[in-house]
Design a protein with these regions (language model features):
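Short glycine-rich or small-residue beta-strand-to-loop segments that form or flank ligand, phosphate
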Residues: 7-8, 32-39, 95-97, 112-116, ...
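Surface-exposed helix-capping loop/turn segments at secondary-structure junctions
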Residues: 11, 25-26, 193-195
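Glycine-rich, mobile lid/loop segments that gate access to catalytic sites or pores
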Residues: 14-138, 143, 148
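A structural-propensity feature for long, helix-poor, extended segments
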Residues: 140-156, 188, 202
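Short, solvent-exposed loop/turn segments at secondary-structure boundaries
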Residues: 8, 43, 167-168
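A glycine- and small/hydrophobic-rich beta-loop-beta segment
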Residues: 158-221
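Short, charged, low-complexity patches
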Residues: 9, 13, 123-130, 173-180
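Single conserved hydrophobic/aromatic residue that forms the stacking wall/gate
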Residues: 1-10
């Protein structure tokens, strides 16, 4: 993942992905590009390209907190959480960071979230878990009702824990999804607590609704 926090221009992503992929020996589709900052400013690629070799050379396993600080814009503090837990007899890790403090509506907007795990999980099972977790966390928060142009939640799983692959819809898969939902919800709450001009943290709970969609409409009315 490569990101910039000066301009929210997402129209230079192919060029950025090509440059990073070439420097790391990857394919373009193995590079995720994210941008946040001022809307409408072109990405200054002429200034970025000469610095990419230096940036790529600084990659390291202990840079998670640096990432959490680097993606801050109007945030007043970094937002990061990391946990480890037993999953079917194997100790696994799950961690992530996020940024966002304003223009958080509707369904994410003006926020980035990067999550990594060493769990070995099929792509479709991970995707389903991510979509469910996002719906119950980042899609359910708002700070000021202002909308924005782009947002991203990325989850990367490398299987480095050495565990046997998770079976779709099995017990370990359900346990991992529960952990992922908890992590995303806590990260989402951290965005609200650090929101621009926020003085209160309010949780709305709807009971007795016939459907989830009905409850959602009532809560967001």
């Amino acid at each position: 993942i490569v990101f910039g926090d000066w301009s929210s221009d997402v129209c230079s992503s192919d060029l950025m992905a090509d440059q990073v992929a070439a420097g790391l020996g990857l394919r373009r589709n193995q590079v995720g590009v994210c941008s946040t900052g001022v809307i409408g400013l072109p990405m200054p690629m002429a200034r970025i390209e000469p610095k990419l070799p230096e940036l790529l050379a600084s990659l390291g396993r202990d840079k998670g907190s640096d990432v959490a600080r680097a993606i801050m814009t109007s945030d007043t503090r970094p937002k990061e959480i990391a946990i480890s837990f037993d999953l079917g007899g194997t100790r696994v890790r799950l961690g992530g960071c996020t940024k966002g403090a304003g223009m958080i509506s509707p369904s994410m907007a003006t926020m980035l979230c990067f999550i990594t795990t060493d769990v070995c999980i099929p792509h479709d099972a991970l995707r389903k878990g991510v979509l469910e977790a996002v719906e119950e966390s980042f899609n359910r928060i708002t700070i000021d009702g202002d909308m924005s142009t782009n947002d991203t939640v990325m989850v990367l799983a490398n299987g480095a824990s050495g565990m046997t692959p998770i079976r779709r819809n099995g017990k370990r898969c359900r346990q991992f999804r529960a952990a992922l939902r908890w992590l995303m919800l806590e990260l989402a709450k951290s965005i609200v607590r650090d929101g621009e001009r926020v003085t209160r943290f309010v949780t709305v709970t709807v009971k007795g609704a016939r459907t989830y969609l009905d409850a959602k409409k009532v809560a967001e009315a």
